[in-house]
Amino acid sequence: MIKIGIYGAKGRMGKQIEECLKSETQAQISILYDKGGNLEELFEKSDVIIDFSSPSGTHELLNYARTMPKPLVIGTTGLDEKILHLMQSASEVMPIFYATNMSLGVAVLNYLASKASQMLKNFDIEILEMHHRHKKDAPSGTAMTLAQSVAKARNLELEKVRVSGRDGIIGERSKDEIAVMSLRGGDIVGRHTVGFYEDGEFLELNHTATSRATFAKGAIKIAIWLSKQEAKMYSINDFLGI
């Protein structure tokens, strides 16, 4: 049995992973860690660690991991360039999987959106994400991943073409503009729409998550897989083989 440590165990995703691991036949919980816990114990007793914490928590985890390398599955969103660079550096001595969404359906959405962006070159692109009222970051990490993918498919630099809101008399939409909009309310687990719009027709690709168990089960499958991999950075495409 693979021993999985949950970093950020008191959060919504941490609790969901704990619940899903109770019925898992290939893995079991080693340590439930939250802020103020014993990091040394977490690393000593775990074969792999799943992180759904906060940017500051992920930063602390990566710094400690250099002293006791273990496979890390990181699903925390809102990470800045400094933390992403630290993650890349740490992957030289341990396998690290990073994704803003652990859903296999979202991975396919990302793949399809990239292909559609290439094929529908004259279509306007708009991205809409919806989440529960408690979500702290906006746009969602998944929405930004989708935006990066469709921009890259058109050889565009996202930071130069992204629009995060519209208000007042702003003029016509530019050709390369990619809007990423956020809605918050209720208990929506997650919904992402990538729309491609042209005169006379439009195509919308949608993914809706109805339960956090979707992300938790995905993270567990990835953790089991990652425990057998060599030191480097991995993405959802590596896991799926696409």
From Swiss-Prot:
InterPro entries: DapB_C, DapB_N, DapB_N_CS, DHDPR_bac, NAD(P)-bd_dom_sf
GO cellular component, one term: cytosol
Keyword NAD: yes
Pathway in which this enzyme or protein is active: Amino-acid biosynthesis; L-lysine biosynthesis via DAP pathway; (S)-tetrahydrodipicolinate from L-aspartate: step 4/4
Catalytic activity, EC: 1.17.1.8
Disulfide bonds: none
Gene Ontology terms describing biological process: diaminopimelate biosynthetic process; lysine biosynthetic process via diaminopimelate
Pfam families: DapB_C (PF05173), DapB_N (PF01113)
Subcellular location: Cytoplasm
Residues annotated as catalytic: 131, 135
GO MF entries: 4-hydroxy-tetrahydrodipicolinate reductase; NAD binding; NADP binding; oxidoreductase activity, acting on CH or CH2 groups, NAD or NADP as acceptor
Positions bound to (S)-2,3,4,5-tetrahydrodipicolinate: 132, 141-142
Major place of residence: cytoplasm
Residue numbers binding NAD(+): 8-13, 75-77, 99-102
Gene3D superfamilies, alphabetized: Dihydrodipicolinate Reductase, domain 2, NAD(P)-binding Rossmann-like Domain
Reactions performed catalytically: (S)-2,3,4,5-tetrahydrodipicolinate + NAD(+) + H2O = (2S,4S)-4-hydroxy-2,3,4,5-tetrahydrodipicolinate + NADH + H(+); (S)-2,3,4,5-tetrahydrodipicolinate + NADP(+) + H2O = (2S,4S)-4-hydroxy-2,3,4,5-tetrahydrodipicolinate + NADPH + H(+)
Described purpose of this protein according to its UniProt entry: Catalyzes the conversion of 4-hydroxy-tetrahydrodipicolinate (HTPA) to tetrahydrodipicolinate.
HAMAP family in UniProt: DapB
Annotated family: Belongs to the DapB family.
NCBIfam families, per database record: dapB
Protein name: 4-hydroxy-tetrahydrodipicolinate reductase
Species the sequence originates in: Campylobacter jejuni subsp. jejuni serotype O:6 (strain 81116 / NCTC 11828)
Gene (name only): dapB
